[in-house]
Structure formats: structure tokens, C-alpha cells
């Protein structure tokens, strides 16, 4: 009560220019050991400055855009004394005991000490017309401080910065050493009191000027000497910017602004500063800000357009892919092969984990492929190899080969590996062919022949191997276990056949077995009817198994429970769109049948007996007639060169009746096309390229017409018999057509010799020079 009366009797500073408010002013003196000077100026909006003395009536001008970082926010003395608004030492009163260092935790009490506008005469704050109640020690301290200020030195209420490194922000004091510029020194000399007219805004502004390059003779410049203090970061950030939770908003306030609103905002602000969660958030945000504050003047922020954030995300993803953290090996190629900018960044970061320095190209490629299986579409794999080529050039800058040349060699090595070690029967690529295929592909120049020979021999002696995915390995092992115990119902493998090394069609190993027995094979022609070299024409005995649309040639006797070896898979032959006929023009051996495949390879097989030969011919042709899918239309082009259309290797989805109608339609189409082709013959005896193309097309149409005639005859017979028993079908054909049911001119064989069928003259062997 006595305190309220005393406050009401004391006039406040600036009553002459400000109307009294309806609400009583709270005591702004020292509470809980916290000085009242500093936070008022730092928390108010720009332009709202306190008046030091009645004599100092001129408001110091200040740029509102200037951000001040170093202020004396509150000076707490360990001996129980505090500095007043005029830098005077305040006496220790009973109300302020006990002194505590962490005044920010007491939000309500501390908020009342932030505004020194309402002076308390009992504390000796030099209100207008009030007696000075300071003791001799206070007066002596002020004289010492004034002499230090006039000499241009600096003063801090703390002897050291140890108090600012406390772990708890609420228990730490904040102090900043502001430089004393000539302007501030002049005001200090002209002012009757040492602290009068020393506006906080001016201190901040001049402090920034001093930090930017003031005269070093007048004191050391301000360089954020306490930037490591989290308490300073929190309070300075609170005073500089609006809070995201709405506690503080910057608004234009002049000297006559609403102080009640300021005091309420200050209470909220200080209470929020005492919240540990909020302080942590502010500290984190301030640490993020400090990283950008370290940039040189005029430098652009790297996070302005998000480039650095995207780059960091790409690096994190690449590191996880390389160390397989949350990813499998099969996921690597899928991530690196995408066609977008982020995937290219990820690929570049991923390749940075590899060091190809000093390695040969094939050695670097082997190292790279051991990290993950290179899977996906052709364009996806090509993108991955592009990133590999770029990284190889970065690690070997002294290599004279360009990046495009390295990429060309890399793709060539991949194709060479498939050609030399793939499951294809065709002729392997020679070293001379490998060199010829790369002519003038090194930016218009040729690669060094020694380099190409070295790469060829390396791939030939040791094939490229890449990592096996763990899931695929476990799946394969589980299939083997299921097969051993009879639990596996269906197994699938991939048979790589033909001249195209990228054509791999899954075939069910548990498909129906139509025939098996001993056959002796001779390769007569390779792909496209090219004559097989003499070194590979020899006869070899196999145990043949016709399972589904695949003719497996095994070295050992057939056993249903035995898995196929790699050599057995290499010798496998597809019989889709194939035609088996009796090789009547081959007189060196008896009981020989000829098999011509969809890619025009020709094989000769010798059976143990005539009956076995006829049975093999019937069953191969019947399987091809039932399961061969309809052919695609031929390509349309203005070129005169004839190209055979590709025949699908997949199984047809048509039923047998629909399949029969499809064959009949195709036969009519071929018959009409052959008739039209023969209407425009070329002169005989001409050996021009045009004549060769004419004869090749006629030979193709004749063979296709004979093949479909055979398919139609056998499929119609099967439908008529109404049974899947092949022995009954063979007996039916033997009854209708005599001893050689498969050699009727109009059905099975386009390769009949003259006089084989009595009373009829056959045409020349439709296979022409292939036999």
C-alpha cells in the first residue's frame, strides 16, 4: 500500500508531453536482480526510443532497416547491484533479494523491469525533480565510468564471457560490447550524465558502422563477440523479427506509441523466451540463419533456388544406394536409369563412390557391374553406362579417348560379352569383326587396334559378371528345394536361342513332353541360311527331348527329374514356325530328316530307324502347327531389298479351330502373293542384285506356302481324330497316306526328289542351296 501511494505521488518522466494512461504503471525498477535498461529499446519497434533526461529532448534519428545485433540487454551484477537507466549502480533493496542469475524464467516479474519509462524515486533513477538517494559508492562508480567513456574505451558489466556459455538459456546473462564512435563520444561529453542521450539505436547503428570498418584508434569494432551464446541468439532474434507463432509483430511506433501494448507484447515475448521448446526452435533457426550470414557480401545464397537442397538429397539417396541402406541391389539400376534431372544427379553422386583411376576399361567395367545387376530396358541400361563412361573419363583425364568414345567401347564390350558367352548357336564374333564393327566410331577416327585386341581377348577369356540380387538367389534356391521334395508345380527358365542375343523367351520346363529319343545332329546352315563352316559341321549324338515348343539336345540320357545344364540350354532349338521334312537328297546317311527353323537355320538329324524318323517329323510339325502364333505383317518399305518378316516365338492364344482358320487365311495370302510375284519375272541368266532379290523372295514364298500346307493338313487331321494321343494320329495318317504319310507333295515336304512319288513330277527342292 505504501508503495502504491509513493508511486502515485511521484511524477513520471515525460508527463509534460504524454497524457496519463487509465491503467497504473507497474514498477520498472530492479526485480529479481534484473536491470531495467536495454530490453525496452531492443524490443520496441524502430523509432521508439526512451528519453534519457529532460534536457535531452531531441529524438535521435535511426534507419528502421538497420538490424542491430549487439545491445546491452540486461546487466546483472553478482554482488547484488544493478545498473539503472543512466548507467548508475542501484542499491540492493530488500525487495530484490535473493539475487538470482536466471531472471528470464520469471516472466511476469522480468516483464515489469523492461520499461524504464516509469521511474521509481526509491531506487534512485533520477526522475525529474527527485532527490538523489545514491550512496557514495554509486557516485564514485559513475565517475569512474564517465572517465572511461570520455577516454574512448569500452565497458562491460561482466569481467568475462564465462557467464554467457551456460547450458540453460534462462540462467544466462546477455551483454554486448558496443564500440564508442566519435558521435557517441561527443554526446557523452555534451550530456550532463554519462548515459544521457546515449540512444540504443544510435549505439547499434554506430556499432555496425564500426564493425564495417571504423577507426581502430577509438576502440575495437563490434564483431559479434558473443555469437556462441544461445541466450543472445534467442533474445536478439526475438527483438529483430516477427515470431512464427504470433507472439511478436513489428509495427511502426513512434515516441508516443501505445506503451501498454508494448508492455503486453513484452510479457508475452519474455514468457515465450522462457519456454524451453520455443527456445530450442529459435536456436535451431538461428543456427540455420548463421550459416547464411557467413557468406561474403554480395554473394548469392545457394539455397535461393533450392539447388543445394536437391543436390544434398541426391547425395543422400546415392549414399543409401551404394551402401544398400533400405534398398536392394536390383533397385540401383532402376534408380540410376530414369530419364530425369534428379536421377542424373543421383547417378553422378553414386558413381562418385567408385574410383577407376589407373584401371583399364574392362577392369573398371567389371568393378562397376559387381556392385549391382544391370537390368531394365535397353535405354535404361544405356543411361547407366553413360554415367559410367563419364566417371571413367573423370578418373582418367590423361586418356586420349573422349567420353563418347569410352561410351562406345563400353556398349561394344557388353554386346561382345553377350555374343561370346550367350546361349546362342550362331557363329561367334571374331576379333577382326569386332575391330571392323568399331571403324571410325572414335569421333570419326579409328580406335587403336592394340586396345581393341586387348579388350577382345579380355572378354573372351573371362566373361563379364555382375552381382546377383539376393531375392533372386533365394528364389532360385527355394525352387530347387521345392523341386527336390516335389512341391514345385511349375519351373520357368530362359532359353536364349537364335542369332539375336537379346531375345530370351521364358519356357516352362514342366511343359508336356511329346517325344524323346536318340538323335545325331549336324549343323548344315546358320542363321539366315548362311553355310556353316566345315569345322562345325560334324555329327554329334544327343538325347533329344521335344518338350513344348523346345527341342532339347542333352548329352546324357533323359531323366524328367534332372535339371538342364548350361550346355543343354545352349544346344536347345525352338520349333515354333519350323518345318521338318525328310532329307531325301542327302545320300550319305539313311533315315535323315531336315529341320528348318524360323530364323532359317538348317539342321540334319539321323534317327535310329525309318519309323523313328517319320515319328519325329510328324510330332515336330504338329507341335509347330498347334502352338505357333500368327505371324506379323511384313514391313512396308520403298527399298527393293527383300527382308524376311520376323516370326513371333510366343505361344498362340487361339484355340485349334481358330488356329486352323488362321493358317488357311495365311495360306491364301501367300498363294496370291506368290502368283503376283511370278507375274513380274526377271530375265534368266542375269546375276544382278535385283535378280538375286527376286529369287530370294520367290524361295521364301514357296517355303512358307509349303509350311502352311503341312500345318493345315496335320491340324485338320488332329481335329478330325478328336484326340490328343499322338500315336492314334500317326496311325490315322499311316492308314490314309500309306507308308510315308509325311512326304505327300501338297502337305509336308517341299524338299522331295524327282521320282520319289510315283506318277507325279515334283518341283525342285524348295530349300534351294540350303541343302
UniProtKB/Swiss-Prot annotation:
Stored CDD domains: PH_EFA6 (cd13295), Sec7 (cd00171)
Entry GO MF terms: guanyl-nucleotide exchange factor activity; phospholipid binding
Keyword Membrane tagged: yes
Annotated positions of the Phosphoserine modification: 191
Entry membrane topology: Single-pass membrane protein
Pfam families referenced in this protein's UniProt entry, alphabetically: PH_9, Sec7
Record domain SEC7: where: 260-462
Keyword Membrane in annotation: yes
Skewed-composition ranges (Low complexity): 218-230, 288-299
Source domain of life: Eukaryota
Compartments in which it is found: Cell membrane; Cell projection, Ruffle membrane; Cleavage furrow
PROSITE patterns assigned to the protein according to its UniProt record, in alphabetical order: PH_DOMAIN, SEC7
GO cellular component entries: cleavage furrow; dendrite; glutamatergic synapse; neuronal cell body; postsynapse; ruffle membrane
Domain PH positions: 512-625
Region forming the signal peptide: none
Listed Polar residues bias regions: 748-761
Coiled-coil ranges per UniProt: 651-680
Sequence ranges of Basic and acidic residues compositional bias: 47-66
Bilayer-spanning residue ranges: 622-639
Keywords carried by this UniProt record: Cell membrane, Cell projection, Coiled coil, Membrane, Phosphoprotein, Transmembrane, Transmembrane helix
GO BP terms in the entry: regulation of ARF protein signal transduction
Region (Disordered): 1-67, 107-136, 207-230, 244-307, 739-771
Similarity comment: Belongs to the PSD family.
Listed name of the protein: PH and SEC7 domain-containing protein 2
Organism: Homo sapiens (Human)
Amino acid at each position: 500500500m505504501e508503495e502504491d501511494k509513493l508511486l502515485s505521488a511521484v511524477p513520471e518522466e515525460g508527463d509534460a508531453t504524454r497524457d496519463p494512461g487509465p491503467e497504473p504503471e507497474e514498477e520498472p525498477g530492479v526485480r529479481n536482480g534484473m536491470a531495467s535498461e536495454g530490453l525496452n529499446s531492443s524490443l520496441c519497434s524502430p523509432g521508439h526510443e526512451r528519453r534519457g533526461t529532460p534536457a535531452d529532448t531531441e529524438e535521435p534519428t535511426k534507419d528502421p532497416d538497420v538490424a542491430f545485433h549487439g545491445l546491452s540487454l540486461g546487466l546483472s551484477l553478482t554482488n547484488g547491484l544493478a545498473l539503472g537507466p543512466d548507467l548508475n549502480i542501484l542499491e540492493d533493496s530488500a525487495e530484490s533479494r535473493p539475487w538470482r542469475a536466471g531472471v528470464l524464467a520469471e516472466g511476469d516479474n522480468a516483464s515489469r523491469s523492461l520499461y524504464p519509462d516509469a521511474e521509481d524515486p526509491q531506487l534512485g533513477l533520477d526522475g525529474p525533480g527527485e532527490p538523489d538517494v545514491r550512496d557514495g559508492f554509486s557516485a564514485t562508480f559513475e565517475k569512474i565510468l564517465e572517465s572511461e567513456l570520455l577516454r574512448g574505451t569500452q565497458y562491460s558489466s561482466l569481467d568475462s564471457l564465462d557467464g554467457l556459455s551456460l547450458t540453460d538459456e534462462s540462467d544466462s546473462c546477455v551483454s554486448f560490447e558496443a564500440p564508442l564512435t566519435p558521435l557517441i563520444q561527443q554526446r557523452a561529453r555534451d550530456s550532463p550524465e554519462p548515459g544521457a542521450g546515449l540512444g540504443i539505436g544510435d549505439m547499434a547503428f554506430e556499432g555496425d558502422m564500426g564493425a564495417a570498418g571504423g577507426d581502430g584508434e577509438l576502440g575495437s569494432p563490434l564483431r559479434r563477440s558473443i555469437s556462441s551464446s544461445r541466450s543472445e541468439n534467442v533474445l536478439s532474434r526475438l527483438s529483430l523479427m516477427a515470431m512464427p507463432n504470433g507472439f511478436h509483430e513489428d509495427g511502426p511506433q513512434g515516441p508516443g506509441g501505445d506503451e501498454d501494448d508494448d508492455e503486453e507484447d513484452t510479457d508475452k515475448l519474455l514468457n515465450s523466451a522462457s519456454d524451453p521448446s520455443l527456445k530450442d526452435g529459435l536456436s535451431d533457426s538461428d543456427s540455420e540463419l548463421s550459416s547464411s550470414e557467413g557468406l561474403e557480401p554480395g554473394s548469392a545464397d545457394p539455397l535461393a533456388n533450392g539447388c543445394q537442397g536437391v543436390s544434398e538429397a541426391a547425395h543422400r539417396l546415392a549414399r543409401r544406394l551404394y551402401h544398400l541402406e533400405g534398398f536392394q541391389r536390383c533397385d540401383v539400376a532402376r534408380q540410376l536409369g530414369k530419364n530425369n534431372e534428379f536421377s542424373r544427379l543421383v547417378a553422378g553422386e553414386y558413381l562418385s563412390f567408385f574410383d577407376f583411376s589407373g584401371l583399364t576399361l574392362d577392369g573398371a567395367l567389371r568393378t562397376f557391374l559387381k556392385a549391382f545387376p544391370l537390368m531394365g530396358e535397353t535405354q535404361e541400361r544405356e543411361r547407366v553406362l553413360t554415367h559410367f563412361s563419364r566417371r571413367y573419363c573423370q578418373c582418367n583425364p590423361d586418356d586420349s579417348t573422349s567420353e563418347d568414345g569410352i561410351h562406345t567401347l563400353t556398349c561394344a564390350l557388353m554386346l561382345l560379352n553377350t555374343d561370346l558367352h550367350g546361349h546362342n548357336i550362331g557363329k561367334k564374333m571374331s576379333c577382326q569383326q569386332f575391330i571392323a564393327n568399331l571403324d571410325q566410331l572414335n569421333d570419326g577416327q579409328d580406335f587403336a587396334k592394340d586396345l581393341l585386341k586387348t579388350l577382345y581377348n579380355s572378354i573372351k577369356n573371362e566373361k563379364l559378371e555382375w552381382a546377383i540380387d539376393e531375392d533372386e538367389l533365394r528364389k532360385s534356391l527355394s525352387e530347387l528345394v521345392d523341386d527336390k521334395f516335389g512341391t514345385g508345380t511349375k519351373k520357368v527358365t530362359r532359353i536364349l536361342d537364335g542369332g539375336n542375343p537379346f531375345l530370351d523367351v521364358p519356357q516352362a520346363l514342366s511343359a508336356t513332353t511329346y517325344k524323346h529319343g536318340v538323335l545325331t545332329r549336324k549343323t548344315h546352315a546358320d542363321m539366315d541360311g548362311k553355310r556353316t563352316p566345315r569345322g562345325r559341321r560334324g555329327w554329334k549324338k544327343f538325347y533329344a527331348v521335344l518338350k513344348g515348343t523346345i527341342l532339347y539336345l542333352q548329352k546324357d540320357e533323359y531323366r524328367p527329374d534332372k535339371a538342364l545344364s548350361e550346355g543343354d540350354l545352349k544346344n536347345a532349338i525352338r520349333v515354333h514356325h519350323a518345318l521338318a521334312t525328310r532329307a531325301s537328297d542327302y545320300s550319305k546317311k539313311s533315315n535323315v530328316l531336315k529341320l528348318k527353323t524360323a530364323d532359317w537355320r538348317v539342321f540334319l538329324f539321323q534317327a535310329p530307324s525309318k519309323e523313328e524318323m517319320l515319328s519325329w517329323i510328324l510330332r515336330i510339325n504338329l507341335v509347330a502347327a498347334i502352338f505357333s502364333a500368327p505371324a506379323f505383317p511384313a514391313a512396308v518399305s520403298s527399298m527393293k531389298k527383300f527382308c524376311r518378316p520376323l516370326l513371333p516365338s510366343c505361344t498362340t492364344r487361339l484355340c485349334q479351330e481358330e488356329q486352323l482358320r488362321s493358317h488357311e487365311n495365311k495360306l491364301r495370302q501367300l498363294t496370291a502373293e506368290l502368283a503376283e510375284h511370278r507375274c513380274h519375272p526377271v530375265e534368266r541368266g542375269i546375276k544382278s542384285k535385283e535378280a538375286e532379290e527376286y529369287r530370294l523372295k520367290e524361295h521364301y514364298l514357296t517355303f512358307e506356302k509349303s509350311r502352311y500346307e503341312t500345318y493345315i493338313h496335320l491340324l485338320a487331321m488332329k481335329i478330325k481324330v478328336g484326340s490328343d494321343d499322338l500315336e492314334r494320329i500317326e496311325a490315322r495318317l499311316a492308314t490314309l497316306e500309306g507308308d510315308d504319310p509325311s512326304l505327300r507333295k501338297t502337305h509336308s515336304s517341299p524338299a522331295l526328289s524327282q521320282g520319289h512319288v510315283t506318277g507325279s513330277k515334283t518341283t525342285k527342292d524348295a530349300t534351294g542351296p540350303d541343302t
